């Protein structure tokens, strides 16, 4: 590369070269005497231990990556104006790798640009469908990396929509993967995190803001992210062996009829992705497609869905250019750590490829599940783990002398022979063959930041079709086995029965290894038998001999002796996870505790074994969760409040369910739900034992008579009977009228809507820690403040703080009223109904105007007028009636509003907007909101739009309550948070 002439006036000046400069110069590097000085040696030592240095291409200096660009600008300005020769084009996988490393992509599409981006993507997809050549597919792979590329850090000169419009103009002008990459320098390896807990909490908070609840829980629990090290790279290479030389792929089946993909199938498949699902090498995330397919875009979204359907049809028909196969069916490779320290490779392929695979799987799922039969429980089978656990447990108890073997294949998904997979697909599921043939006949590229690995064997872990393809490859082995109990959950097999028969089946598995590419991992295989079985041990040298105390299957104990050790391990792991919850905000911590870390975390264990026999361990678990709850909320919970917190939200609690109370009903409900499937895999004598266990479990619940027989397979029917019993007990033992009124108010419909809101600061649905503490304390009747005098009126304030809600000078009244109306106005505008606040000309006799008026007719040609109010359920004037009549206060407030605005009802459609401080609303308000819900759903296409509006209204009430509480403590409360 020719650097061009160097201007003597700028770089050859002795005075400038002799002056210690911030940037290194050739003169400094070229002076031998200076290199020999102690200072120079110390600087060299610092360079050796500090950040990596990059050589300047125009001089002999070395600089940090951040400083090199500045050095070139200052010392070599003439280089910028000299035309540089175009470099030789790199392979597509290397260009994608560079774009992955250097081009950050927006996680969402800003609303202001969604229509433009959707039109551009539709044009690209139509070009792919029409031409189906390499340039059109390359444009599709480059689309997100160019159009949705984020600006440089610190670049605030343009708004985000302006950035995307500029990127879109560059893309239309021909910019592809190299767009803006030359201004960046590759980042080095990421250092390992110094605080795993803080990093996990940060990732969990981000995923929760994106709506991925399960992803947030996994991130908070996870310690399994592998660093970008040479050891991890070598382990990943070892996980992807080369193709065997004797591959023999089948021919394409004749007359493969594939039904055209509909737009409804496209929309359903896009909606099925997790909210924070990652992008593949091309940078296009499922969230991007969800934004661009929003019904709010109308015909633009419909055109995009049709174009996506056409491209999906191309892929399902197998007509993608062969040169694009390794890229389109490659993936971004992620390394995760297993519990034993080994590496688990996860392939995140392009969203378009995953979309086609999801649609193909939906069309062929029933045929595949029927073909695999009842013994393969890991593919498309509902409650597969529960079926396996119950069946194995019943067999072990019915046949105490039988032998049981658990089989585990080493690196199974990445080593199964692809020709075997394709033969099984061609023979049994020909509708999948064109797509599977595209994906797995040829090697594909697995792209990392610092390497590209060739995938030549197995199926990708991350491919929506991967589990089905692996199970199809394992099917010939599964149908050949003769043991009395044969269960498979993906690559984990369980054989039980006569020792000789089981030993013979193990030999069949070993014989199948050569034909399938699979290999058993003896160190993870287990043998359970009361007597030593030499034949089995000789077949599996190095396998473990398992005792009754540690016999488990799919995470469930198979013997009564194994229940307590497994519960103890669960307690240890849960304690570590609960310690991380306080690292989040209180609202996020409470949300995850209820959704993922209380009874939800124990759900599988409670449903697959009689854990109720270990009451002490379950009590210990409940105490652990209660301690985490009080830590998160910074709130003391008396026994009655703790009991109420263990109720579901719809029963007036917080949803922190007690595992001790639910253990028996969970087990009984699971046994009833899987009874029909268990009958297909168990021999008669074991099935009789299963039926006897089911009857005993149903009687053990104590509420069998209260659950109808047709609902005994539903866990909710069992748990509701228990929760209703506890709620009635709390109500009967409530010592004060205010407590009775509170308990009746909090279990009304919609009273707990705010607890279901996703706590996201970006959405404006997160409560700050103090507000959450007051709101939960009000709901549970727990003390939230010390007894004091109100700063506003001087009246005494009890420890429950209720005075702030009914104080004549309540600080929360006006902010709460404003937030309620702002929320409703935004909802009406989103539904396409413009409106105005406090309309003129509609004054009442007292000179006050209603809160709002729609500017277009709302129903039957009438304009809607509304006026809002929030009444205190526990106010002295209402509390006695509210203790016996739920909703008395809000119904009375609605009637008062109707009387006040009776004159308007002849010319307008009037509706009150009345809420209680404890969250419930009146019947007229419910009718009004129902009409808004339907219009919102039609306008947005989101069936959850109505519940989202109710959650925001409920949050507005709770924020006002918190301000009222704080107002008793200070004469100048903080301003309300108005999202």
Predicted regions and their residues:
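Catalytic palm subdomain of template-directed nucleic-acid polymerases
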Residues: 412-428, 489, 493-515, 812
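Non-catalytic C-terminal interaction segments of nucleic acid-processing enzymes
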Residues: 702-789, 793-794, 811-812, 826, ...
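Conserved pre-catalytic core of RNA-dependent polymerases
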Residues: 192, 204-208, 252, 256-468, ...
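Catalytic palm active-site di-aspartate
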Residues: 280, 332-333, 344, 360, ...
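Surface-exposed loop/turn segments and immediately adjacent short secondary-structure elements
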Residues: 84-324, 341
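C-terminal recognition-helix end and immediately following basic linker
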Residues: 47-54, 58, 64-85
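Extended C-terminal regions of large enzymes
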Residues: 89-92, 130, 144-217, 221, ...
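A conserved non-catalytic segment of reverse transcriptases
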Residues: 422, 455, 507, 511-608, ...
